[in-house]
């Protein structure tokens, strides 16, 4: 039973690790494509337009407009919903500086998303691994002692095991007493042999 419990704990730890790895992959390598709009357009608030692979969380369009107005736009032309994000690179800079800035900006971005076919294939593979691990856990639980037995049957089994344990303990104590008797006899024989060898000899 202890071995089954150890395997069950190991499988649970592995399942938690697989959950974490799956969520990490889906979050990192998703292409962030817009979802199909629902039939009811008012079921969720509209979100402000964000740049692809932006690390900033999406915010409602109304909140973005209020934020833009609170920043004190002098011309009032910036009425579109804009999500706060990193400043755009300077367009007046030279080509070399622009490439360097783009490279620096590329370093801070997350990895490129997988293609839809690759993403779907890996998503299915991760889901299959989760199902297999869950089936292993169900099997280990099914072979645990007491599964499918009533409370009375488990109590009878416990009492029977207690009786067997007491019988084994009594047998062990009996063997220990016999061992002590045999040890005393061996010590007496060794003492007699030692006395016979060294006691009667004279020089």
Curated annotation (Swiss-Prot):
<dbReference type="InterPro" id="IPR021384">
    <property type="entry name" value="Mediator_Med21"/>
</dbReference>
<keyword id="KW-0010">Activator</keyword>
<dbReference type="InterPro" id="IPR037212">
    <property type="entry name" value="Med7/Med21-like"/>
</dbReference>
<comment type="subunit">
    <text>Component of the Mediator complex.</text>
</comment>
<keyword id="KW-0804">Transcription</keyword>
<comment type="similarity">
    <text>Belongs to the Mediator complex subunit 21 family.</text>
</comment>
<keyword id="KW-0539">Nucleus</keyword>
<protein>
    <recommendedName>
        <fullName>Mediator of RNA polymerase II transcription subunit 21</fullName>
    </recommendedName>
</protein>
<dbReference type="GO" id="GO:0016592">
    <property type="term" value="C:mediator complex"/>
</dbReference>
<dbReference type="Pfam" id="PF11221">
    <property type="entry name" value="Med21"/>
</dbReference>
<keyword id="KW-0175">Coiled coil</keyword>
<feature type="coiled-coil region">
    <location>
        <begin position="147"/>
        <end position="190"/>
    </location>
</feature>
<feature type="compositionally biased region" description="Low complexity">
    <location>
        <begin position="74"/>
        <end position="83"/>
    </location>
</feature>
<dbReference type="GO" id="GO:0006357">
    <property type="term" value="P:regulation of transcription by RNA polymerase II"/>
</dbReference>
<feature type="region of interest" description="Disordered">
    <location>
        <begin position="70"/>
        <end position="118"/>
    </location>
</feature>
<keyword id="KW-0805">Transcription regulation</keyword>
<dbReference type="GO" id="GO:0003712">
    <property type="term" value="F:transcription coregulator activity"/>
</dbReference>
<comment type="function">
    <text>Component of the Mediator complex, a coactivator involved in the regulated transcription of nearly all RNA polymerase II-dependent genes. Mediator functions as a bridge to convey information from gene-specific regulatory proteins to the basal RNA polymerase II transcription machinery. Mediator is recruited to promoters by direct interactions with regulatory proteins and serves as a scaffold for the assembly of a functional preinitiation complex with RNA polymerase II and the general transcription factors.</text>
</comment>
